[in-house]
Amino acid sequence: MSRLFLACLLAIFPVVSMKSPIFGPEEVTSVEGRSVSIKCYYPPTSVNRHTRKYWCRQGAQGRCTTLISSEGYVSDDYVGRANLTNFPESGTFVVDISHLTHKDSGRYKCGLGISSRGLNFDVSLEVSQDPAQASHAHVYTVDLGRTVTINCPFTRANSEKRKSLCKKTIQDCFQVVDSTGYVSNSYKDRAHISILGTNTLVFSVVINRVKLSDAGMYVCQAGDDAKADKINIDLQVLEPEPELVYGDLRSSVTFDCSLGPEVANVPKFLCQKKNGGACNVVINTLGKKAQDFQGRIVSVPKDNGVFSVHITSLRKEDAGRYVCGAQPEGEPQDGWPVQAWQLFVNEETAIPASPSVVKGVRGGSVTVSCPYNPKDANSAKYWCHWEEAQNGRCPRLVESRGLIKEQYEGRLALLTEPGNGTYTVILNQLTDQDTGFYWCVTDGDTRWISTVELKVVQGEPSLKVPKNVTAWLGEPLKLSCHFPCKFYSFEKYWCKWSNRGCSALPTQNDGPSQAFVSCDQNSQVVSLNLDTVTKEDEGWYWCGVKEGPRYGETAAVYVAVESRVKGSQGAKQVKAAPAGAAIQSRAGEIQNKALLDPSFFAKESVKDAAGGPGAPADPGRPTGYSGSSKALVSTLVPLALVLVAGVVAIGVVRARHRKNVDRISIRSYRTDISMSDFENSRDFEGRDNMGASPEAQETSLGGKDEFATTTEDTVESKEPKKAKRSSKEEADEAFTTFLLQAKNLASAATQNGPTEA
């Protein structure tokens, strides 16, 4: 029973279920004896291109009788004066009707398939009588906002008499303009009389910027008495016939407004008119833009005063009538030239839906998927940033052929995957300045241009990497990227960025990450290993995640490649850690080196002078910078030795108060440490610090954690048992040995110069 009830409803309301995608002019007007051309649009699918097209007339009971169709049928009334032409490549068909009569007035439908179905559009045709035949007057027609010149002949007898033009009303004819200089207030600065000479028996009345209210009957007169020459004038003001524009949902449309060279330097506007209300400005050349079109509209001035407006990411509410015009204030006003369009937005679109807003955190990244017409797979694709300029503009940032804006180096990439109808844009290292609107554009079908809004919000990036890494020429490099547990099932990758994209590199999974303590079992470290670093390895590297063909978050690392300074000790391997862990590891490493090796400060000074870890050195650095660094190092070395001696002296004082000493060997320097100072026996063991290099050993001394990075494997051996000596004797002997080593080092630094030190 329910199925029968549903079938009855569908039979009664066949067009309620969906909006018809067929679109045409709502009203068509003409006069007897002339012809009309009616264009109807349909979605250019394969089925629609080959489906029957028809033009039918609606009867009193709602039935639509076919008059002409694409299958060759023509009714008797249309034989010899009508035809229907299909244009499948553009998704349109045109009905031409000639020799119109008043009987042709009525309501019609243009449609596809069977006339009883809902795939059609209602059209009203009105045919009126020729006004010239009806009024026996001289008919002048003029477009709204244009100029009309009315010629008024007269006899020689009235050549010296007053010439005038008046407009008829129901009871009178009020003066518009005359040859004495009078001009009505309604026509001020718009109307004047022109007399070419005494030998010419014609005077002209010129009316500029014609308004709709100017339409009507006029009397052109020479003389004021009974012998005056009079001519009846019928002035018809034509509103612009709206041009039909058919756009798919989420697609783009362009309005080309050509108002003529006479208004080339006058400000232009485009306004939208809905439900017979006022025409609200969408954009004008003075910088005004409607909020509803923010970020998805631009205007482009062209030659000869042409004003072109492009609107992207069409919405259902964008449908309606649009009017462009020229007016000094950039606002709609009667009496200025205009051009009109009727926009229909088809909801049955082939353009896939995509997010209109994407969000990313400061320092993080966003990924934008841009659709394009699959037929344009080989066309150039690019991404531009919409700017709030006077006319709105969208300068390109990156394209499929390479990066355009240098300030986006290492941050922006456009990735294409042929065949799937989309390309991907990735932007990382986000800042607040990246907030705004962006366009996805191709050189092919401009209807596929789309807009996305980028918002930068508070938060922390999900992927953890160091920002800058220094790699040594000829040595191995390991870059580590920490992924949180939410990306456990995602594909992870490393790639090397270039201005043409990001080339994938082989990676290895290092197991759980210590950077995310809330879900260690699911967080991961994925590393990139370079066995032997070359100068070509310098540049930007990205780590990221993918879920199938879709790209996710990314993080960027800059790798600077440098040569080691002569005399420096080489680390076995450079291992990059997350930014936070790297800072802690670096602090511990410096503290331990100061205690273990007096030459540390000299080494650090040389490293800093060479550039140190981080971004590339400034190419504009002065040439005298190297000499200044050498002098600075020469000054700092003695100061550093004094500081180190002070640290050791403090250690000696503390050592005198320690008892029950066990001996631990640290390189060549031996220190007595009380077993009671250790918190537990596990502190004797070296542990890998995940934020530092593999050789970092962690030891707890007096409640402080210090990290010492060794350059060679430390071997611990038991010493033979010797006679027990006092703590004071051991400390004095160690201090004396240290002072001798410091003195020798200072002498070597003075003789060999700061570079050797």
UniProtKB/Swiss-Prot annotation:
PROSITE patterns: IG_LIKE (PS50835). Disulfide bonds join C40-C110, C56-C64, C152-C220, C257-C324, C271-C279, C370-C440, C384-C394, C481-C543, C485-C519, C495-C502. Keywords: Cell membrane, Disulfide bond, Glycoprotein, Immunoglobulin domain, Membrane, Phosphoprotein, Repeat, Secreted, Signal, Transmembrane, Transmembrane helix. Glycans are attached at N83, N420, N468. GO terms for biological process: immunoglobulin transcytosis in epithelial cells mediated by polymeric immunoglobulin receptor; signal transduction. Residues 19-632 are extracellular. SMART domains: IG (SM00409), IGv (SM00406). Residues 19-126, 145-237, 250-341, 353-457, 461-560 form the Ig-like V-type domain. Residues 654-757 are cytoplasmic. Residues 679-688 have a biased composition (Basic and acidic residues). The chain crosses the membrane at residues 633-653. Residues 607-627, 679-730 are annotated as: Disordered. Residues 1-18 form the signal peptide. The modification Phosphoserine is found at S665, S674, S681, S727. One of its GO terms (cellular component) is plasma membrane. Pfam families: V-set (PF07686). Found in mammary gland, jejunum, lung, kidney and small intestine. InterPro entries: CD300_family_receptors, Ig-like_dom, Ig-like_dom_sf, Ig-like_fold, Ig_sub, Ig_V-set. The keyword Secreted applies. In the absence of dimeric IgA, Ser-727 is phosphorylated which allows PIGR to function normally. GO terms for molecular function: transmembrane signaling receptor activity. Interacts (mainly via CDR1-like domain) with dimeric IgA. Interacts (mainly via CDR2-like domain) with pentameric IgM. The Ig-like V-type 1/D1 domain contains three complementarity determining region-like loops CDR1-3, which mediate interaction with IgA and IgM. This is Polymeric immunoglobulin receptor. It comes from Bos taurus (Bovine). The gene is PIGR.
